[in-house]
């Protein structure tokens, strides 16, 4: 009788684990335990993929999660930036940015929200001013855009001189002769 109870208990535990669990690799668990994990040199997936792969050392040194990522202290704006990053194996389910500040003068705000972003402008706008919200998804078409991690140091991307999303790398290399996003992990030239 006790053997049946133990067998049923173990079977229930197996069913609960299989129903409520997520399959992740051991690299995420190992990276979060050492000096190279989390927000260290190999964030978030360790050094297993090598120096040039987007999830290895290159990702840790050039992305917002790693050693040289842009931080509030070095952002070249007045009032600091709003860096939002996730080094988790689980995708974030939502991001909300709300502000009830009063802005006077010319205001230009640009950024990217993950997957689907909703922007709203409410309140009284002066008659001499204008307010506009431009929303796009992907590269101007209704699709998801896939971008690789930056391989330059993180501070270079903040000033527009790096290979990151704000520098020379992504828009300049999207030419048909070199393939889509020629460079690291592109579809053309075997790069």
UniProtKB/Swiss-Prot annotation:
Q: Name one GO biological process term.
A: chorion-containing eggshell formation
Instruction: List the record's Gene Ontology CC terms alphabetically.
Output: egg chorion
Pfam family name, one: Chorion_1
Signal peptide location in the record?
Answer: 1-21
Q: Keywords on this record?
A: Repeat, Signal
Tell me, what is one Gene Ontology molecular-function annotation carried by this entry?
A: structural constituent of egg chorion
What's its job?
This protein is one of many from the eggshell of the gypsy moth.
Q: What family is it from?
A: Belongs to the chorion protein family.
Question: What is the protein name for this chain?
Answer: Chorion class B protein Ld34
Organism of origin: Lymantria dispar
């Amino acid at each position: 009788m006790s053997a049946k109870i133990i067998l049923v208990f173990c079977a229930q535990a197996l069913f609960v684990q299989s129903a409520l669990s997520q399959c992740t690799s051991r690299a995420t668990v190992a990276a979060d335990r050492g000096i190279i994990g989390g927000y260290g040199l190999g964030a978030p997936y360790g050094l297993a993929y090598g120096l040039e792969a987007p999830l290895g050392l290159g990702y840790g040194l050039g992305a917002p999660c790693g050693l040289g990522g842009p931080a509030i202290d070095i952002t070249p704006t007045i009032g600091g930036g709003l860096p939002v990053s996730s080094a988790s194996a689980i995708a974030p389910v939502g991001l909300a940015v709300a502000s009830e500040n009063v802005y006077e003068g010319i205001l230009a705000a640009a950024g990217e929200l993950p997957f689907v972003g909703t922007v709203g402008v409410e309140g009284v706008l002066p008659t001499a001013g204008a307010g506009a919200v431009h929303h796009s998804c992907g590269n101007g078409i209704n699709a998801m855009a896939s971008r690789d991690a930056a391989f330059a140091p993180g501070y270079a991307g903040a000033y527009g001189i790096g290979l990151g999303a704000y520098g020379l790398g992504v828009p300049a290399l999207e030419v048909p002769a070199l393939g889509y996003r020629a460079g690291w992990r592109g579809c053309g030239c075997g790069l």
